[in-house]
A protein has these predicted regions:
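Glycosyltransferase donor-sugar binding loop
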Residues: 65-67, 286-306
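Membrane-proximal helix-turn-helix segments that form the acceptor-binding/catalytic region
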Residues: 163, 175, 179-215, 224
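Conserved donor-binding/catalytic core segment of Leloir-type glycosyltransferases
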Residues: 250-267, 273-278, 287-289
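Nucleotide-activated donor-binding/catalytic signature segment of Leloir-type glycosyltransferases, i.e.
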Residues: 301-324
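Short alpha-helical donor nucleotide-sugar binding micro-motif in glycosyltransferases
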Residues: 331-336
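Aromatic "clamp/platform" in nucleotide-sugar-dependent glycosyltransferases that forms part
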Residues: 344
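Short hydrophobic beta-strand element within catalytic cores of glycosyltransferases
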Residues: 361-364, 374
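Conserved acidic donor-binding segment of nucleotide-sugar-dependent glycosyltransferases
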Residues: 376-377, 381-388, 396-402
Length: 445
């Protein structure tokens, strides 16, 4: 485990002001995150960029078990320095599975203790470096929030994923009721170990959240989920979108729909394929799945194979685009007829905003945070989690150019008006200012 400076660049304007003795115009912030891919990292990228524009100084602290993904939305152009606190993952190749499961419980406790030791040292370092506050990005289950237990500085947690509801049961072994007694007992013993690991993570997660001076969430759904989970109050600070990058390009639209997100079952790409398969072959669009991952970092290769086989069996044309560059993604949004977004209880769903900013209607599941960004009948179509309903919505868009054009225009205008990152940071700074005493000059402008 180590804490070290990765020797990142300093923003030249800030250095020049410090040399000249200019009065400090903004806060000095320690920004802690895990450097994962996905919407939470994009949010960190955009928020840090906007904070740097406004004169705030940000140092990055990457806190994680294992190696971070440093290539996905790096914060380096906008920060002063980057530090990393890392714990190497503990290999667990024991067999049989029940032995590995119970050894995993001991390893989980060992890693929690190791992190606590490092976070005690880090808490002292952060205080010595004179930060105004510590910002911690949180996605359950996340080890980052354990840092609050070792801080004397004010701490702000931004909870991108407030609950583990959509992960529950994914590792549980099942045994039919008519299975032999030994098989049922074996599954129960394994599941007991899995439950203990989950319990350890929940306890540490809740303790860390309770230690924060302020908790922010990205949606009303996340705020409600956090309160339901542990009666913890929070404030909503919604995401935005970079409308200078994600914008209509007026490109021809192919008879194709897009499903976006990591290749994991909770993103429900298979539901999109099944929905498209309900449409007659003559009208059936192709499906493109865009994922921020590369095959080497893909979380669930088995699920990827299942998707490809399902598309083949259902006679749906499927293409998977891995780790597209930003401009490629913008072009992709502009070339498809719709984003079909059906994840399980998505806390927010940043890709829906990106698609709408490009003038692409969103067919979204009426769940979670998606209900708060997609306006049914105005910027897209909301449906229940039903492949037939989703298929009918896709078919409506394919058959009606008038509907596509109307939703497209309204979606782009709506996002440009209501969902820009500048508004996110306005809200963020107001909330931070309510818990930080003596804000520096112009910090809340």
């Amino acid at each position: 485990m180590s804490l070290y400076d990765t020797d990142r660049r300093t923003i030249a304007v800030q250095d020049e002001e410090e040399r000249k003795g200019s009065p400090r115009q903004g806060w000095t912030i320690a920004w802690c995150h895990t450097a994962d891919s996905g919407g939470s990292k994009r949010a960190a990228f955009e928020m840090v960029r906007e904070l740097a524009k406004r004169g705030h100084v940000v140092d990055e602290y990457i806190l994680r078990i294992g190696e971070p993904n440093l290539k996905h939305w790096p914060l380096t152009p906008f920060i002063r320095k980057s530090y990393r606190v890392s714990v190497p993952p503990i290999a667990n190749r024991y067999r049989p599975y029940v032995l590995a499961a119970w050894i995993g419980v001991m390893q989980e406790r060992q890693q929690v203790r190791a992190l606590a030791c490092q976070f005690r040292d880090l808490g002292r370092e952060l205080k010595a470096r004179g930060y105004d506050y510590v910002h911690i990005d949180h996605c359950f289950p996340s080890y980052t929030v354990q840092l609050t237990e070792h801080l004397s500085l004010p701490s702000i947690i931004y909870s991108h994923e407030a609950t583990d509801a959509r992960f529950q049961g994914q590792d549980i072994l099942s045994a039919p009721s008519n299975a032999p007694w030994w098989r049922r007992n074996y599954a129960a013993l394994c599941n007991s170990a899995i439950s203990k690991v989950v319990s350890i993570r929940r306890q540490r997660d809740l303790a860390g959240l309770r230690g924060a001076g302020l908790v922010l969430t990205n949606s009303c759904y996340s705020k409600e989920a956090l309160f339901q989970r542990n009666h913890l109050s929070s404030s909503v600070c919604r995401y935005g979108v970079d409308v200078d990058t994600f914008k209509p390009l007026r490109l021809p639209r192919a008879k194709t729909v897009l499903s976006a997100g990591r290749i994991v079952e909770k993103k429900q790409h298979h539901t999109v394929i099944q929905a498209v398969a309900t449409i007659s072959e003559a009208e059936r669009p192709a499906v493109i799945i865009a994922t921020p991952e590369t095959p080497a970092r893909q979380e669930d290769p088995d699920y990827s194979h299942r998707l490809e086989q399902m598309a083949k069996d259902l006679r749906v044309k499927l293409e998977i685009r891995r780790n597209p560059a930003e401009q490629e993604l913008v072009r992709l949004y502009n070339e498809v007829m719709a984003l079909v977004f059906m994840p399980i209880m998505e806390p927010f769903g940043l890709v829906a905003l990106e698609a709408m900013a490009c003038g692409t209607p969103v067919i979204g599941v009426r769940e979670g945070g998606i209900r708060e960004s997609v306006v049914d009948g105005v910027t897209g179509i909301l449906v229940d989690r039903n492949v037939d309903d989703a298929g009918k919505a896709i078919e409506r868009l394919i058959q009606s150019k008038e509907l596509r054009d109307r939703l497209s225009l309204q979606a782009a205008e709506y996002v440009q008006r209501e969902w820009v990152w500048a508004k996110t940071i306005d809200c963020y700074l107001r909330e931070v200012g309510s818990v930080i005493s003596n804000p520096p000059k112009a910090a809340l402008r």
